[in-house]
Amino acid sequence: MPSPLILCRYLPRELSPTVDSRSCSSPLVASRAGKFLGATPPRAPRLSRRLAWCFIDWGQVCLLHRLGSGGFGSVYKATYHGVPVAIKQVNKCTRTLRASQRNFWAELNIARLHHDNIIRVVAASTRTPEGSNSLGTIIMEFGGNVTLHQVIYGATRSPEPLSCREQLSLGKCLKYSLDIVNGLLFLHSQSILHLDLKPANILISEKDVCKISDFGCSQKLQDLRCRPSLHHIGGTYTHQAPELLKGEIATPKADIYSFGITLWQMTTREVPYSGEPQYVQYAVVAYNLRPHWQAVFTASLTGKTLQNNVQSCWEARALQRPGAELLQKDLKAFRGALG
């Protein structure tokens, strides 16, 4: 059995798993459920209620099926103490061990935080069942089977296919946008940057609420300020702000840029770019390349209002983009004007 990290590593003050360069956002690929990692779970120690999330009561874990797998491990649907949850197992891969460790600790940047539009961490531990090839396990609330990406592009694992036209009316688009911005506003108020915001990382619950998930690229602002060398950020190139592509230090405005691309996707139901990633990245920085404006943005007054919102979010200079609070105010006013 691997030795656990010392307890002080779990304390809130020590939960500072910032990262520099790493590969992130490997899309989850659906696969058949397999046997859970081992048969002999470690015994959970007695902890105060404040620290209860730091360890997993393995006897209360019941795996249902695998939801998918990616570069850093697998995600399962399960129950924990009888409640539906998602369990992320981070692989112990020698080739990418350091990146996997960073991903694991970055996911815990949101530990002990609670917000309706943020996936909640229920429990986490570096102690894993004997014989497993995992460096850590994270139990999260189950946010739903469907992502915003699946709603936009019509692909879903749900038994009943979604109708994009029904699911993404203007009203629905604004509702989802406000959910996402509310989540960002909360994260930024806690000095946390997501840094990989995109439709595939937005879960939609059974109550039709958007929840921001996948914090494997997240960073804390104070760590970026204390250690400026941590400025080379992982993420998804189509949604990365120009300043990040240039290797500059991340700010909350980087998440706003990513939201602008996401809002464009919700409105057009198109993919942002075509072409080789390196050419797209160069053009975004050197030539201010952005996704093409579609007719939906110019055909009506509401379309033009949406265009203005998107345009403000993906401005080349971070200082020219609105903060989450102002963006929330504008979207609420827009939604209210529609009645």
Swiss-Prot record:
GO terms for cellular component: cytoplasm; cytosol. ATP binds at L67, G68, S69, G70, G71, F72, G73, S74, V75, K88. It is an enzyme of class 2 (transferase). The active site is at D196. GO terms for biological process: cellular response to cAMP; cellular response to nerve growth factor stimulus; chromatin organization; ERK1 and ERK2 cascade; establishment of meiotic spindle orientation; intracellular signal transduction; MAPK cascade; meiotic cell cycle process involved in oocyte maturation. It holds the Pfam family Pkinase. Its main location: cytoplasm. Its EC number is 2.7.11.1. One of its GO terms (molecular function) is MAP kinase kinase kinase activity. Serine/threonine kinase involved in the regulation of MAPK signaling. Is an activator of the ERK1/2 signaling cascade playing an essential role in the stimulation of oocyte maturation. Belongs to the protein kinase superfamily. Ser/Thr protein kinase family. This is Proto-oncogene serine/threonine-protein kinase mos. The lineage of its organism: Eukaryota, Metazoa, Chordata, Craniata, Vertebrata.
